[in-house]
Amino acid sequence: MKKTLSFIALFGLAFVFAQTAANLTEFKENIAKQKVEAKKALKPFRYDGSKVTYFNFKTYKQVKEVEIYLFNNTDYRFSFNGKSLPNDVTIKIYDKDKTVSDRILLKEVSGVKGQNLVVESSDLNKVYQSKKSGSSRLKRVFVDYEIPGVPGSQNKKPTMKERGAVILVMGYKN
């Protein structure tokens, strides 16, 4: 009897582990496909790089920040893919990082879930120059992903349904 129960418990654990591994593999495969899709949205700009930001939805609000350098007065295009999001997030783009109190909000986008969005640095520069007179072009921008709290989330052991990612692909004008 003990051997039978041990076998059933071991089999059940193996099944749960295999299911989780399969879900994670599927999640990463979807991200790879969505990265290709985001890369296509860069045209006619040339691909420069990408950054996938992974996170788990929790019961409290979170902010993840990514810094992007802008070189040599070059125009850039940023493609954000939010098709790996089970819940919506807000993207805010600033001129300085989140530790600086007088930073300028250059662009805010909500409704990212299920979308592929494009933002150009030329538009960000126009906003920056209009809000800060006498300034030159931006040398870098900070992308903040505001992740809302989701009631009922598992903070300690999140499920695959609470896992999300935003794919950011960057390109420059040639």
Show where each model-derived region lies.
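Bacterial Sec-dependent N-terminal signal peptides
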Residues: 1-24
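Alpha-helical structural elements
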Residues: 10-12, 40-42, 49-50, 71, ...
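Short linear sequence elements within intrinsically disordered, low-complexity coil regions
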Residues: 12, 16, 50-52, 81, ...
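Acidic, Ser/Thr/Pro-rich low-complexity intrinsically disordered segments
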Residues: 20-21, 56-174
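Non-catalytic extracellular/lumenal accessory regions of secreted precursors
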Residues: 20-64, 172-174
